[in-house]
Regions:
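Conserved nucleotide-cofactor-binding alpha/beta core module
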Residues: 1-49
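Non-catalytic C-terminal accessory region of glycerolipid acyltransferases
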Residues: 24, 33-168
């Protein structure tokens, strides 16, 4: 199974469109709050699966707890991929996309980490964010952010959130 994680939208039309987009290539869109259940279910039944997480989004206010430099700006980054990978010791694979010609793209699977529990807390998130930045710099025209990626400043985080859990 191939799962794509998504945040359900309040607007039914927009939500349906997002689910349709995330359903391409036989993917199964899973609301973000259900992903752990899906992972446990698939592991228990011995099924192979791939779960797709989008790492270029900005965390919500309650999750401003890990910051690093991203595209030359102090940026809060999501840590969910690392938390889930470490909890279940799942390998993390990144996707690198390139345009072949109009409407045609190729995707390479890049092994980021096969044993996340062997890393220090926060290291996988740093590796993932650096790789994402490298991919963006290689082909910036393939990236479109329809949200405000840098809408938060570090002062937004409560007391800098335990002084940035996992920060060195």
């Amino acid at each position: 199974d191939f799962f794509t994680l998504y945040k359900p939208l309040h607007d039914r039309v927009a939500d349906g469109m997002m689910r349709k987009i995330r359903s391409r290539f036989k993917a199964k869109p899973v609301p973000k709050n259900d992903i752990l259940r899906k992972i446990v279910e698939n592991r228990r039944e011995g099924r192979l699966f791939l779960a797709g997480f989008i790492g270029d989004q900005t965390p919500n206010w309650a999750n401003l707890n890990f910051w690093m430099e991203f595209l030359h700006q102090d940026t809060p980054v999501l840590v969910g991929t690392e938390k889930i990978a470490r909890k279940f010791n799942l390998p993390v694979i990144s996707l690198r996309m390139r345009k072949v010609r109009r409407g045609y793209y190729e995707v390479d699977f890049v092994d980021l980490c096969s044993d996340p529990q062997s890393l220090e807390p926060g290291e996988l998130t740093r590796m993932h964010t650096r790789m994402l930045e490298r991919f963006i710099r290689e082909v910036p025209e393939l990236w479109l952010w329809s949200h405000k990626r840098w809408k938060h400043v570090r002062e937004d985080s409560i007391g800098s959130r335990e002084e940035n859990r996992w920060q060195k």
